[in-house]
């Protein structure tokens, strides 16, 4: 074994060992770890769940962060002991509520969000795809194209069509059970994707049909869409290329997000996916993350209520993302009116992300998640990553079942819009 | 007017910190354990030096001669990989000197943001999502709107359709008077909606830097005293008083302010300085709306409303400048006066996002104050809130360096203003003024969205 192999092996083992050891708090809570949204405890609790597939038993906070608002000031009504047996609870949701088109059901109200090749490593992408297959759910390609290595998992891969149109080809649309239009992203609403020059390696450039080491800023908006009618043409285009595909429309959360949702419904979308302002990104101007568009906690009830008032709520799936960190966040999002959630950052945390925010840099991520560096990428072995993501979702499903059991609900679909089960904290 | 069309752009260039800034992170190793680990690894990897000494940091923190025994702390970005690999040896935390930066209003993060913007002239772009508090008071409780499918388009930072950040300062007539149509405009156009407000403290070098920067940027700076320098005179907004009128008449400024609370100088200034724009300077209080309407009726060309340096107004029960501004703006609108006068707001406008938010609340443009001193690496010696006793002490600087830092700051804020405007689908910052419908308030949304959810008992 050459030195490079030994070095990668050494650090890989050490990192993996650290992820096992840190949550037991033998060395205390690392002082520099975490922030108000992803607290140190929440990060360590996620490591623990990714390791064991179970909820932390040592008192680590795994339900909420410390941001002082949104999901963090919502809790559950005191509901006493479980009223339904956990194993009888159904967590599955439908992703197509229209009469026509293929029926797709996922066993958990969760699928993986778009993280593009280039913004993340191929190994992490593979780990996500493998986990999606094992869980019988989905992950999204993000806008960076469709690497050949994930084709074997195509039944569980959502092809994203974003404004840069990177890697959007007839076959990648035909592979997809679901095609996702990304109109906007919560972390940088109205601004289009950013992939800074250092991460545009030859492989990334080839996939995106661009020049190496040149920053790639996706346009905003789609230059072919300036109305709901234009949007319908987009939907028709996908359904012509792949009539079996469901269409998801990913939008940000402007003040008229309810109008956007109803427009998407009338254009023929199966899923309206709202991505709140506190979502993740591989790179975004800091000003965009905090200040543009509303958090998803406020957008969900607005959209849900409006779709109800229009009488179409049961014909379209409402998916929420952008700051969904825990099983409790998912359940709260559903109680506020969503059908299910998309998560991405939590998957990254499961494989060792510390939410340090250095993803945009040259070599990118120190633990091989958001990097295109061939050496660093090897820290995430796809099989190892798959296991951790599956474990995390397994632990989350236990928590979801426990919440539902307490309220005597046998089906996660019955939780939708049940704001009466929530309480607010000051 | 330039002879050929040129898109407005502020040219930035690096102006590195002159005074050392604190390391953000403090990384340290338990030395005995580190030594033991090295011995252990030496055995494990059979003295393979390259493998044993390969370090758990891609940023070079342990790249110095003594590796982990003497980490290069300034290189640490807080990625925590060393802690992940060696939790029994390594500690990374925010450094004490970083945590001490600023005061009760200026957070260490805000100070670092301004220092880096002034130094690099580049928009802060980072990976991962937002890390801070959910909403908050004042500007933190406001989100700007965006639009999914509108123009102007954005193809990269500079490849977008043009968005104007120009604003007009001065009184605007309510109707066209054809008898005066050949006269020069009574307003002045500024390419960015930001001026430099009067500084609480400053040495000659700081004043020179501000004057030079204002001149380069085509904006203005407010000062009580005229600078003794050759540059920046055209960009100066003096604060006039009774005794100084004759001096002003000798060299009429384009814009002049006066303390409207202390004196009723408008008539005098307007008659003696007919070519100048006369702005009444007022502290924001509960009655500011009424006073603003009265002054606007009397004919002032503009109002400069200021809060304290933490953005709190001077009411008996202080409220944030965002709330007071809205009240003044709305009273002027109700009185049919808003389009006639210019509103300048200052106090607590310290970060790039505060500019569009203050404009949404009703200002035409803003004045910045403590941010200028922070960009010029002034020293925090206590609270900065009080305008008369602000504990932000300027250091000795090279005026050229200082001017470049301020140009960089404006360049970065201009670019960030454009990011906000483009996300909203607005082509002209003038259209943002008072457009509360294109913003979202935390307090309002919370009540709407969480309606019916019981309070925990």
Task: Spell out what each predicted region is.
Chain A
Residues 78, 97-99, 108-110, 119, ...:
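Solvent-exposed, flexible loop/coil residues
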Residues 180-228, 240, 255:
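Active-site cores of enzymes that catalyze phosphoryl transfer or operate on phosphate-rich substrates
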Residues 352-419, 423-424:
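Active-site or pore-adjacent capping/gating segments
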Residues 159, 217-381:
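Glycine-rich phosphate/ribose-binding loops and adjacent secondary-structure elements
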Residues 1-110, 114-203, 387, 397, ...:
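Conserved, well-structured core domains of diverse proteins
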Residues 127-138, 234-241, 263-267, 302-306, ...:
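Generic, well-ordered alpha-helical scaffold segments in large soluble proteins
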């Amino acid at each position: 074994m050459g030195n490079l192999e030994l070095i990668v092996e050494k650090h890989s083992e050490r990192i993996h060992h650290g992820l096992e050891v840190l949550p037991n708090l033998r060395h205390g809570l690392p002082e520099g770890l975490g922030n108000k949204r992803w607290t140190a405890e929440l990060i360590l609790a996620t490591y623990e769940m990714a390791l064991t597939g179970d909820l932390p038993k040592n008192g680590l906070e795994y339900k909420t962060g410390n941001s002082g608002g949104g999901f963090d000031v919502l809790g559950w009504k005191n509901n006493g002991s479980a009223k339904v047996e956990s194993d009888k609870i159904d967590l599955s949701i439908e992703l197509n509520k229209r009469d026509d088109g293929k029926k797709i059901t996922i066993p958990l109200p969760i699928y993986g969000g778009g993280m593009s090749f280039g913004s993340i490593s191929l190994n992490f992408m593979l780990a996500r795809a493998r986990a999606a297959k094992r869980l019988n759910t989905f992950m999204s390609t993000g806008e960076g194209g469709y690497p050949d290595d994930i084709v074997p998992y195509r039944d569980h891969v959502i092809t994203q069509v974003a404004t840069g149109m990177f890697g959007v080809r007839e076959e990648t649309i035909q592979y997809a059970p679901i095609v996702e239009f990304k109109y906007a992203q919560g972390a940088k609403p109205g601004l289009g994707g950013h992939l800074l020059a250092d991460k545009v390696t030859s492989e990334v450039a080839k996939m995106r049909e661009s020049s190496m080491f040149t920053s790639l800023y996706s346009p905003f908006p789609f230059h072919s869409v300036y109305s709901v009618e234009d949007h319908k043409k987009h939907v028709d285009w996908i359904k012509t290329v792949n009539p079996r595909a469901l269409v998801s429309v990913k939008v940000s959360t402007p003040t008229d997000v309810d109008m956007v949702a109803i427009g998407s419904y009338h254009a023929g979308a199966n899923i309206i996916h709202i991505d709140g302002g506190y979502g993740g990104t591989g790179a975004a101007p800091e000003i965009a993350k905090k200040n543009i568009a509303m958090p998803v906690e406020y957008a969900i009830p607005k959209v849900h209520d409006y779709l109800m008032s229009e009488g179409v709520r049961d014909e379209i799936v409402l998916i929420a993302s952008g700051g969904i960190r825990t099983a409790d966040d998912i359940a709260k999002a559903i109680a506020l009116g969503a059908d299910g959630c998309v998560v991405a950052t939590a998957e990254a945390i499961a494989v060792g992300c510390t939410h340090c925010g250095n993803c945009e840099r040259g070599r990118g991520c120190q633990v091989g998640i958001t990097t295109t560096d061939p050496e660093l990428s090897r820290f995430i072995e796809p099989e190892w990553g798959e296991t951790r993501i599956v474990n995390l979702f397994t632990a989350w499903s236990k928590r979801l079942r426990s919440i539902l059991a307490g309220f005597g609900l046998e089906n996660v679909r019955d939780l939708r819009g049940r704001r009466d089960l929530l309480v607010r904290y000051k | 007017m330039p002879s050929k069309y040129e898109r407005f752009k502020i040219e930035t260039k690096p102006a590195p910190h002159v005074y050392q800034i604190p390391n953000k992170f403090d990384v340290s190793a338990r030395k005995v354990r580190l030594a033991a680990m090295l011995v252990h690894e030496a055995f494990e990897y059979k003295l393979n030096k390259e493998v044993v000494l390969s370090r758990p940091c891609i940023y070079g923190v342990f790249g110095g001669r003594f590796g982990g025994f003497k980490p290069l702390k300034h290189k640490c970005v807080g990625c925590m990989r060393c802690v992940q690999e060696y939790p029994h040896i390594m500690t990374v935390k925010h450094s004490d000197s970083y945590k001490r930066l600023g005061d009760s209003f200026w957070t260490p993060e805000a100070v670092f943001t301004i220092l880096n913007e002034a130094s690099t002239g580049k928009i802060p772009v980072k990976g991962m999502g937002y890390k801070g508090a959910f909403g908050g008071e004042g500007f933190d409780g406001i989100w700007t709107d965006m639009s999914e499918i509108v123009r102007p388009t954005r193809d990269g930072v500079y490849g977008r359709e043009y968005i104007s950040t120009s604003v007009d300062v001065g009184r605007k007539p309510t109707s066209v008077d054809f008898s005066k149509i050949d006269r020069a405009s009574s307003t002045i156009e500024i390419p960015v909606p930001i001026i430099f407000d009067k500084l609480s403290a400053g040495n000659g070098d700081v004043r020179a830097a501000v004057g030079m920067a204002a001149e380069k940027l085509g904006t203005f700076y407010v000062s009580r005293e005229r600078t003794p320098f050759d540059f920046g005179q055209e960009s100066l907004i003096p604060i006039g008083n009774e005794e100084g009128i004759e001096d002003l008449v000798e060299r009429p400024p384009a814009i002049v302010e006066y303390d409207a609370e202390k004196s009723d100088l408008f008539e005098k200034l307007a008659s003696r300085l007919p070519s100048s724009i006369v702005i009444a300077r007022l502290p924001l209080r509960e009655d500011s709306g009424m006073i603003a309407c009265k002054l606007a009726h009397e004919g002032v060309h503009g109002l400069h409303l200021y809060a304290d340096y933490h953005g709190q107004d001077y009411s008996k029960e202080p409220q944030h400048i965002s709330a007071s501004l809205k009240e003044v703006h709305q009273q002027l609108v109700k009185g049919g006066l808003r389009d006639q006068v210019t509103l300048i707001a200052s106090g607590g406008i310290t970060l790039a996002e505060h500019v569009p938010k203050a404009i949404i609340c009703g200002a035409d443009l803003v004045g910045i104050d403590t941010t200028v001193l922070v960009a010029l690496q002034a020293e925090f010696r206590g609270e900065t809130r009080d305008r008369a006793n602000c504990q932000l002490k300027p250091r000795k600087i090279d005026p050229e360096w200082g001017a470049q830092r301020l140009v960089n700051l404006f360049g970065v804020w201009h670019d960030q203003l454009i990011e906000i405007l483009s996300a909203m689908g607005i082509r002209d910052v003038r259209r943002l003024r008072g457009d509360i419908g294109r913003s979202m308030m935390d307090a309002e949304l919370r009540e709407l969205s969480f309606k019916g959810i019981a309070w925990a008992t």
